[in-house]
Amino acid sequence: MKVNKWTLGLATLGLVSLPGTGLAEEKMNQMWTALSSTTISGYVNTSIHWNTGTGNGHTPAFSYNGSSKQDGFNLNAVKLAIEKPLDEAQWAAGYKAELLFGPDAVSYLTTLDGNTLTGGDSSAAAIKQAYVALRAPIGNGLDFKLGVFDTIVGYEVFDGGNNPNYTRSYGFTIEPTTHTGLLGTYQLCKAASVSAGIANTHGPFINQKADAGGLMAESYKTYMGSLALTAPDDWGSFAGSTAYFGVVNGLNTVNAGPAIQTS
């Protein structure tokens, strides 16, 4: 592109823009606009365990509380999350990816190399969530998650800082943690929302397909649903509190019977 000295001088002063420069700036602005709505977060989870006596080899069968953590200092997990949340538009799209690293990532059973508690290394990486988020302009807005997402039942979660206690209950130990499938959520009103979904299995293995053995069917899927009720602002100390009711029903592993979880 040929540019005379007069145009070049005006461009230097910022009074005009060169065609190529304007196009490049437009592309950069589009890129920064896309990145401005993307968030990166995470945490490092460490612990100190000390049990009196010599019973460290027979600890209660709670998740992430094995004998290898007793009487010492531990790195539990490192989490890295990248998310572009849905905006307020009627049609919206986003995504979320959460990766886990460290010993607790092995116990989550979604390691990238396929290793689990038997044969997995203590520095493994695992996928906690990885889904595409979509919104359709139906009523108040119907939101979808397609991919790997957290289960809809249970009071406790993997992220230790979000639990009321450091140790998790036996209920968390037997509950599903993650599913690979499609989940839809609809906000009925300010005080109530419902969710319904379908997944490959009861979880947690990513992309695993269920097989019920002798039952005659092309494929078997896991079904789930939940209802969330939020207390209104005039309920005093209970204002903003939420009660969840949910059920997950489906096959867990190959040739296994159905598993039903409610909360």
Describe the residue ranges of each PLM region.
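Bacterial N-terminal signal peptides
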Residues: G9-S17
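A generic structural signal for short coil/turn motifs at secondary-structure boundaries
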Residues: V106, F205-N207, V254-A256
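Sec/Tat signal peptide C-region and signal peptidase I cleavage site
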Residues: L18-A24
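Bacterial N-terminal signal peptides that target proteins for export
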Residues: M1-G9
